[in-house]
Amino acid sequence: MTTSATLFSRAQQVIPGGVNSPVRAFKGVGGTPVFIEKANGAYIFDTEGKQYIDYVGSWGPMILGHNHPSILSAVLKTAENGLSFGTPTPLEIELAELICQLVPSIEMVRMVNSGTEATMSAIRLARGYTKRDKILKFEGCYHGHSDSLLVKAGSGSLTLGQPSSPGVPEDFAKHTITCEYNNLQSVKNAFEQYPDQIACVIVEPVAGNMNCILPKQDFLQGLRQLCNEYGSLFIIDEVMTGFRVALGGAQSYYEVTPDLTTLGKVIGGGMPVGAFGGKKEIMQYIAPTGPVYQAGTLSGNPIAMSAGIACLNELKKEGNEQRLAMLTKKLALGLKNLANQHNIPLVVNYVGGMFGIFFTTQNEVTSYQQAIQCDVEKFNLFFHKMLEQGVYLAPSAFEAGFMSLAHTDADIDRTLQAADIAFASLCSSSFS
């Protein structure tokens, strides 16, 4: 029995399913999850010392790579002064100013502790500000696990084959309208049915929780226009895409301006952080300046703030945004080329530092329905063959992959060599 298997067995005795987030259990791909002991740069190391090229990056935050010296130095220096104060700090102002500088649609920002907390708070703010109850989201998009948003959700919920979760009251779910991602007509229909009831539209600008699905041309702009027409707020959930698709987020890449933005992952540099922000007029509706309540014991934690500041300052350096996109493109096109050589139907979507692979005979994957029609079994075989060779992909056919600035051309080349062998295995009788 491997060390990971022993640890997993032990974990299952005291942690539900042996993990603290469902997708980590490998239920989507089968087998035993790999237990990681340390990480550095583009690599993670399991408890037996095996090294993997990491394309999960802690599910997105590690955009600079693991254990980056600037972040580590900032965290250690800040920790010497204390771990948490429960008071305002200079560091939270500095990170807020940095976020407002990099994302022009954000005039004010409130720090929280997770992406789920950010989206939950933004939804409450939108409802309070508009004095409306209904919200509109998209099938296959995931915005955290708050009750209002865990309706036909993607991510781990999609992986486990549960379109919604038990424990979400119907009274909550009835206020959530679910439309088709990349189908603007479905949104128009919803607004026509509930013209004065929709508080907000919330969307992942790149749907990273049904793998990696890009918005069709004018989809995001169309949502903006509909929100303007019907008096609803437009929320772009950049927890995953923020500072990763582009330095100003996916909203800058696709040239669309939301009323509110939610952030997480990258802004913590690996520490637990979330944030939501937007127009000053709307944000001032939050307590203590407004009637909508939101609070948090560890919000604005100084160590997390220092990590976020260090991370964003590194990302601002000239050439980093372009290099991240270049590495992602090299990997994506390389995988597609190898699949073609092996006559394996494959669609590879990518943008900025995100990518997704779909085993499918379809020419493109632009919707939830197309995503769930892909060959999950073939992905699972590919995943394990890559894992054997020291390449760690997301353990689910419905999760995006993440590039980091620590990855090198040599890492991409090694990954493609492993993929060549994995594709060949898929063609062999033992994997057919």
From Swiss-Prot:
It catalyses: (S)-4-amino-5-oxopentanoate = 5-aminolevulinate. Keywords: Cytoplasm, Isomerase, Porphyrin biosynthesis, Pyridoxal phosphate. Its EC number is 5.4.3.8. One of its GO terms (biological process) is protoporphyrinogen IX biosynthetic process. Its cofactor is pyridoxal 5'-phosphate. The keyword Isomerase applies. One of its GO terms (cellular component) is cytoplasm. It is found in: Cytoplasm. Pathway: Porphyrin-containing compound metabolism; protoporphyrin-IX biosynthesis; 5-aminolevulinate from L-glutamyl-tRNA(Glu): step 2/2. Pfam families: Aminotran_3. This is Glutamate-1-semialdehyde 2,1-aminomutase. One of its GO terms (molecular function) is pyridoxal phosphate binding. NCBIfam families: hemL, PRK00062.1. The gene is hemL. It comes from Histophilus somni (strain 129Pt) (Haemophilus somnus).
